[in-house]
Each structure stands twice: as structure tokens, then as C-alpha cells.
Swiss-Prot record:
GO terms of molecular function: ion channel regulator activity; toxin activity
UniProt keyword terms in alphabetical order: Gamma-carboxyglutamic acid, Ion channel impairing toxin, Ionotropic glutamate receptor inhibitor, Neurotoxin, Postsynaptic neurotoxin, Secreted, Toxin
Protein name in UniProt: Conantokin-Qu
Localization in the cell: Secreted
Transmembrane parts of this sequence: none
GO CC entries: extracellular region; host cell postsynaptic membrane
Residues modified to 4-carboxyglutamate: E3, E4, E6, E9, E13
Length: 17
């Protein structure tokens, strides 16, 4: 769903930080 996609994107950004 939309939330899952947003969460996945946030996780990527946090992991790259």
C-alpha cells in the first residue's frame, strides 16, 4: 500500500544517513 511504500523510502533514507 501507500504507507508501505513511504515507510520503505524513509527506511532507505535513514539507512543512508
Amino acid at each position: 500500500g501507500y504507507e508501505e511504500r513511504e515507510v520503505a523510502e524513509t527506511v532507505r533514507e535513514l539507512d543512508a544517513a
